[in-house]
Amino acid sequence: MSYFEHIPAIRYEGPQSDNPLAYHHYDPDKRVLGKTLAEHLRIAVCYWHTFVWPGHDIFGQGAFQRPWQQPGDALERARQKADAAFEFFTKLGTPFYTFHDTDVAPEGDSLRDYAANFARMVDYLGERQQASGVRLLWGTANLFSHPRFAAGAATNPNPDVFAWAATQVCHALDATHRLGGENYVLWGGREGYETLLNTDLKRERDQFARFLSMVVEHKHRIGFKGALLIEPKPQEPTKHQYDYDVATVHGFLVQYGLQNEIRVNIEANHATLAGHSFHHEIANAFALGVFGSVDANRGDPQNGWDTDQFPNSVEELTLAFYEILRHGGFTTGGMNFDAKVRRQSIDPEDLFYGHVGAIDVLALALERAAVLVENDRLDALRRQRYAQWDDAFGRKILSGGYTLESLAADALARGVNPRHASGAQERLENIVNQAIYGLR
């Protein structure tokens, strides 16, 4: 059965085409900085927003009428959902997908049901991957939707909930390994608190760290070679989450000795909620040595919640890609569309429109970022700004050649009187705009 039979495979037709079901800027075979756009972007479609979300919100029931979401045998519906998903991936021409365990398999009424259903669906997903050539960018476990996780999973006050969560992650990591996944993501949606009045912060942090240590141990035991990634988010659904932003996650990992085992998966909308730019979070991840992968979407700065809209800003993404490209690009990570159509976008075509437009935006932004990397104007000015630290005096300070006292004595003896130099922010912003809009 075809779920999108009236929609053709999406092809590159160029910027002059007015076909809404064609790529206008994303030519997967176009080479930029020595790689094709497909190799640079490593695009993935997420299962949850695209095939699981029924179009509901807190004020209304599901607005969609997807065939695979209708009542019926749960496992059969899961197989239909997988068929629809892989038809979608294939027609879109995207090389990767992502999932939560309970996106792809019914949870059932017990932990045994969960394990059995998930095992059957992992077999089926493997068949679909083999037939289509689509690969798994990353898997994860849903440890936030069921009421048992209302007080968290790893940070729950009940150790049986911790054990249930550990079982899910064990199976999901095993499945990711078996399906050839390149990463495994840990998003602590309810690893936080709603009130400090009933929360033991130290205990919950210790529990979370113990859980992560067990995941790391299992990864090595089964021989999984992919990356483990934490996805930072400041709040929602909890008031405050322990993986608030990139810097917070890094500090947590260092505190518990996990900084060499776990990296970050950065979502644009989560950066917005944390009061940061997407650019900031990506740059910070590289500075701290924990960059892993990206969830591509956007939030609404006028809303205080996670809107998960498709990315549409070439300007914002150009700076994000600039950081990624100048640090060598993705390794195991990629650009996963953690984005959903709007509740009123009920037609099957809308799923394609959202992804096609966003993929074109990624392609445009990456090419504009490549201009910034190639012309080296930003980096040249940055190097010039810090050039004195590469001189003998600067190197001596950083290498430990001075104590605080001896440096003070040296400064007094030389009568240092440094002068402020321009930061040239306006010039730098002009350079970015010239690259984005093709002015130079």
Swiss-Prot record:
Signal peptide: none annotated. Mg(2+) 1 binds at E231, E267, D295, D338. The active site is at H100, D103. Its EC number is 5.3.1.5. It comes from the Bacteria. GO terms for cellular component: cytoplasm. One of its GO terms (biological process) is D-xylose metabolic process. GO terms for molecular function: magnesium ion binding; xylose isomerase activity. It catalyses: alpha-D-xylose = alpha-D-xylulofuranose. Mg(2+) 2 binds at E267, H270, D306, D308. InterPro entries: Xyl_isomerase-like_sf, Xylose_isom_bac, Xylose_isomerase. Keywords: Carbohydrate metabolism, Cytoplasm, Isomerase, Magnesium, Metal-binding, Xylose metabolism. It is found in: Cytoplasm. It is an enzyme of class 5 (isomerase). Belongs to the xylose isomerase family. PANTHER family: PTHR48408, XYLOSE ISOMERASE. Homotetramer. This is Xylose isomerase.
